[in-house]
Regions:
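Short S/T/G/P-rich N-terminal loop/turn motif that feeds into the first structured element of a domain
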Residues: 1-69, 76-88, 96, 100-118
Length: 118
């Protein structure tokens, strides 16, 4: 698990002033490829962390027994999310992980409710 530092209070206040735009990806890895996929995801996270304008944050949930990863990303705006999807750092990463994926679905989602911090 990777632990990050808390951003400065001004950044938190600015981020909370407008609701984020969310994207969720559900990824089923090919048999025997889960660990390799997760390792590449961690490398990508470290590569782009704090480098992409408009990205508020992300979470990766994993189910090793099922070979499934759920990625949740939040962006300042829908335009920021689209810009990220076209960013060469992202498209090149997709090319690297594509051979490890059995199936994947990505979708924009809206916050229905929120309780506590996750």
């Amino acid at each position: 698990m990777i632990t990050l530092t808390v951003p400065d209070p001004a950044a938190v206040v600015a981020a909370l002033s407008d609701p984020p735009v969310f994207s969720v990806s559900i990824i089923q890895t090919k048999p025997g490829k889960f660990d390799e996929f997760v390792a590449l995801q961690h490398e990508q996270f470290l590569r782009v962390r704090g480098q992409v304008q408009g990205v508020r944050g992300s979470r990766m949930l994993q189910s090793p027994a099922k070979g499934v990863v759920v990625l949740i990303s939040s962006f300042d705006t829908a335009q920021d999310a689209e810009r990220f999807r076209r960013d060469p750092r992202f498209t090149e990463h997709l090319e690297r992980v594509q051979p490890l994926i059995d199936r994947a679905e990505a979708m924009p989602v809206e916050l229905a409710y929120e309780v506590g911090l996750i």
